[in-house]
C-alpha cells in the first residue's frame, strides 16, 4: 500500500489511534479538531506523535462551497462547524495539488420518473405466484382417482394432492442387487448422533476467538487506498464520508468503517407521509406540523423511488412529549410553544429607550442630550431578556427535560 501524499485527519482518526504515519506522508488538520478531544489517553498520544502534525485553516470560499453542497445532499444538519472546515480543507488541498476539474459541483439529484410496472401489482416476487386472470378449475381425470390417505394425522395437507410414492423399498432392492449392506435403524441413529457431535465440535474458521482477535484487529486497521491518490481524508463520520464521496474526493477508511455507497436524503412527514427534498425545512409543507424525519432514498433503474427506513426505535422517540401542553397565553410577551408553521406570534420589539441610537448628524438630534446609548434594565422587554425581534416568540421551550442555565449572570 503506497502512502498518500496529503492526508486530512478528523477527530475520529485520533480517537481510534490510527497509524497515520503509515497512511500518508503529510498529515493535516485544524486546531478545532484537537480542541474537541477531551480524554486523557488521546491527549497523551497527541503530545508524542511519531509524525509532524500540520495545522492549516481552509479559505472562506471553500467553506462556503462545502456548506452549500452539504445542504443539497441533506447532510448539513448532521455536520458541525468543525466537520465542515475539515471537508473544506480536503477540498482546498485537492484544488491545490490535483485540481477541481474532476470534482462535482452538484450532487446527484433524486428524480422520480414514470414506471412501467404499477406499484399496486407487484411482479416477480420470489416465493409467490401471482396469476393475471383466475383460471377455471380443472376436472380430475377419471383414470387416476384421488386416493384417500390411510393416516389422518396430516389430513389437512393430503386433501389437495395425491400421496407421494414411497421409494424406500426400491432403494433397498438396488442396494441388494449391488451387494451392499443395508444399515439398520439403530446404526443410522448412532451415525447421525456422531455426525451431529462432530459438527458441534467444529468451531469453524469464521469465529472470533481470543487466539485470533489480534490478527483480525490488525486486518481491520489496514486502510485500503486506491492507486494514484494524492489527497485523502481519514474520518469515521458517515455524514462526512457521504459528502466526500458525492463530491468526488477520496475517503480513507480506518478500522473498516466506510460507507459502501453515497446516498441522498429527503424529509418525510410521519403525519401525512408527504416528502420534500428541501432539507432546510422544519415544518411539513403539506400539513404544517413539526413531523419531518430524514430518510435515505435510492432510485432504481426503472425510476422507482425506494425509501430506506430505520429500525431503530429512537428515530421516533416520544421523549419529552408525555407532558401536556401549557394553556395558550395572550399578550405581547406570552411564551407559547411553536407547534405549526402558520402559527402567529406577537411582535416582540425592544423598548423605545433600548432602540435609541446616537446620530449627531440627524436633523432631529437634540443637543445637550447624552451622546451615549442608555442601557435599559427597567422595562419589561429587558426583564424578559428580549434581545431582538428576529427571535420570534422568545424562549419557546418544547421539552421540559431540556438542560437549562443554572447560573444566570446578575446585572
UniProtKB/Swiss-Prot annotation:
Intracellular or extracellular location(s): Nucleus
Gene designation: NOB1
Segments of skewed composition (Acidic residues): 182-192
Ranges annotated as biased composition (Basic and acidic residues): 136-147
Assembly description: May interact with UPF2. Component of the small ribosomal subunit, ribosomal RNA processing complex (SSU RRP complex).
Known EC number: 3.1.-.-
UniProt region (Disordered), positions on chain: 120-148, 181-208
Native species: Pongo abelii
Nuclease among keywords: yes
Entries under InterPro entries matching the protein: NOB1 (IPR039907), Nob1_euk (IPR017117), NOB1_Zf-like_sf (IPR036283), NOB1_Zn-bd (IPR014881), PIN_dom (IPR002716), Ribonuclease_PIN (IPR033411), WRNPLPNID (IPR033461)
Single GO biological process annotation from the record: visual perception
Sites where the protein binds Zn(2+): 269, 272, 284, 287
Top-rank lineage group of the source organism: Eukaryota
One annotated Gene Ontology cellular component of this protein: preribosome, small subunit precursor
The family this protein is said to belong to: Belongs to the NOB1 family.
Role description: May play a role in mRNA degradation. Endonuclease required for processing of 20S pre-rRNA precursor and biogenesis of 40S ribosomal subunits.
Entry-linked Pfam families: PIN_6 (PF17146), WRNPLPNID (PF15017), Zn_ribbon_NOB1 (PF08772)
Domain PINc: 5-108
Main location per the UniProt record: nucleus
Name recorded for this polypeptide: RNA-binding protein NOB1
ZnF region ranges: NOB1: 259-331
PANTHER family given in the database record: RNA-BINDING PROTEIN NOB1
